């Protein structure tokens, strides 16, 4: 039964990923959020996921960059931007989960998001958004006015 559920989850994530990320990623923000929610909201530890995008906002790479503990995933802006340069990315979408179930951003979430955005600007790499997903929903830091 568990193997069947894992297969079903994998198929669902594949379908959501294809729908959300096949064209320009910014074309359907709700589809991207739905994919990230399905992929991350129920994970038992914090993860930082990075969507690396090209100049046409098409996906170059969807990568789990960092896996942390139950309440923290250390974000290293230098490493995120180094990887962006390696990939030839011109834009990013960050996403991380809150295993606590509450997607509200912490002060540190906001500070690090702004740090990545500012450092990225110097390298011509735009941070389009940072989504925080949890079992109870998701929040866009851009829509929330934090970016």
What are these regions (language model features)?
Residues 51-54:
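Short hydrophobic alpha-helical segments used for membrane anchoring or interfacial signaling
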Residues 47-49, 128:
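Short loop/turn microsegments at loop-to-beta-strand junctions
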Residues 41-44:
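Short loop/turn motifs at secondary-structure junctions and domain boundaries
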Residues 12-33:
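Long, charged amphipathic helices and adjacent flexible linkers at domain junctions
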Residues 1-9:
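Helix-hairpin-helix
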């Amino acid at each position: 039964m568990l193997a069947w559920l894992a297969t079903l989850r994998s198929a669902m994530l594949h379908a959501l990923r294809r729908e959300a990320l096949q064209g320009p990623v910014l074309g359907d923000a709700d589809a991207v959020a739905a994919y990230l929610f399905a992929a991350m909201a129920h994970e038992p530890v914090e993860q930082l996921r990075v969507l690396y995008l090209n100049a046409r906002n098409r996906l170059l790479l969807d990568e789990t960059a960092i896996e942390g503990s139950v309440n923290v995933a250390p974000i290293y802006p230098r490493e995120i931007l180094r990887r962006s340069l390696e990939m030839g990315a011109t834009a990013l979408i960050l996403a991380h989960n809150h295993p606590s179930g509450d997607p509200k951003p912490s002060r540190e979430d906001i500070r690090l998001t702004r740090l990545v955005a500012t450092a990225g600007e110097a390298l011509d790499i735009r941070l389009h958004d940072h989504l925080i997903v949890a079992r109870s929903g998701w929040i866009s830091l851009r829509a929330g006015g934090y970016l």
